[in-house]
């Protein structure tokens, strides 16, 4: 798989669960990736490493590049992303793929990719431009420029929510590879 961009910023303004698991799925789809939560009030991902500690103590050599294949997660820990800019740049330089998880109230318009449930109707105020859509139980026309993910298996979601990595051959995980392969610029 060819990564068009080594770092992607995503957010899910409409679905909190999707906002928590999408960065993990995107990381698993890349093979080896770092997921960095830029949301001060983000999910309680497993692990001890936080962006706040990397800013306060400085990253170690082992923080700046993968030590094994798979995903690593950096929880936020209460730091504003603007205060972490140097650390974030160093992480992007050292990792083959980085996923930045943005808060649900992110405004957009800065190249970040919205992850949205594919639901009928027009009640929701959707961000303009391309997006990743999560198929739900309805047949809905896909907005132009969007990537549509198939419905995930319940075991896949359960694994991600429990801090386990689903099989990389999982249909839903494989579908996330298209997000890496797309040119979002």
Give the role of each language-model region:
Residues 38, 117-120, 136:
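Cofactor-binding loop segments of dinucleotide-utilizing enzymes, especially the Rossmann-like FAD-
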Residues 1-9, 130-185:
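C-terminal lobe/tail of nucleotide-utilizing enzymes
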Residues 6-15, 34-97, 104, 155, ...:
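P-loop/Walker-type NTP enzyme "switch/lid" segment
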Residues 32-33, 98, 112, 130-131:
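Hydrophobic anchor at the start of a short beta-strand
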């Amino acid at each position: 798989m060819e990564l068009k961009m080594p770092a992607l910023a995503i957010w899910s303004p409409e679905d909190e669960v999707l906002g928590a698991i999408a960065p993990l799925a995107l990381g698993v789809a890349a093979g080896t990736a770092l997921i960095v939560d830029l949301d001060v009030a983000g999910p309680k991902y497993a692990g001890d490493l936080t962006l706040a500690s990397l800013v306060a103590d400085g990253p170690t050599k082992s923080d700046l590049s993968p030590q094994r294949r798979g995903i690593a997660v950096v929880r936020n820990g209460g730091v504003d992303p603007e205060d972490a800019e140097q650390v974030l740049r160093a992480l992007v330089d050292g990792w083959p793929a980085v996923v930045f998880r943005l808060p649900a109230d992110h405004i957009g318009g800065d190249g970040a990719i919205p992850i949205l449930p594919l639901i009928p109707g027009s009640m929701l105020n959707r961000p303009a431009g391309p997006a990743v859509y999560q198929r739900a139980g309805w047949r809905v026309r896909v907005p132009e420029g969007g990537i549509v993910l198939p419905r995930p298996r319940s075991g896949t979601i359960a694994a991600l929510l429990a801090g386990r990595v689903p099989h990389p051959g999982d249909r839903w995980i494989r579908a996330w590879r298209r997000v890496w392969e797309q040119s979002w610029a």
